[in-house]
Amino acid sequence: SYTPYQTEVSQGRLEALMNFQTAVCDLTGMPLANCSLLDEATAAAEAVSMMYALRPRDMQKSGANVVFVDESIFPQTLAVMTTRAIPQGIQIRTGKYSELELTPDIFACILQYPNASGNAEDYRAFVEKAHAANCKVAVAADILSLALLTPPGEWGADIAVSYTHLRAHETSAHL
């Protein structure tokens, strides 16, 4: 009987990850995918850190440090983002995305798709408004729903995160 060498096992894992990332890109409408974060909440917190690091120079100089989080996000995602934001000096502001006035201190927005109430909101106009204010937009999306819903990448999201089961514990963040 044949026992596979470690390199062949590693190659098989790499191929599985590549196929998984390709499927994630197709579902999210994003050009790149990663598959090594723990859960959606952690991936969302990483998205906040990434968007904070990517602030334009004028936002950095002005001290823009607020991320807007739509109130319909899952509570565990909000809790992890808040915990991770505090040591970085990032403030979390929650509210209704439809009522948000984008002030100069807001550098990014996070949306849930579908939201915690199960509604699949049409965020296109909001994303355009955020981009016009030089804000990045991240979306925490249900990956299975994206087989039927319009992917976040198609309506302009900069980052999409999701909880997926590659091996019962791995998730993905997408840029």
For the regions a language model picked out, list residue spans one by one.
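PLP-dependent aspartate aminotransferase-fold enzymes
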Residues: 1-105
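Aromatic/hydrophobic pocket-lining residues that form π-stacking "cages" and hydrophobic walls in ligand
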Residues: 81, 126, 164
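Anion (oxyanion) recognition and catalysis
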Residues: 86, 131, 153
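Active-site phosphate-binding strand-loop segment of PLP-dependent enzymes
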Residues: 93-145
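Conserved small/polar residues in nucleotide/adenosyl-binding loops
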Residues: 164-171
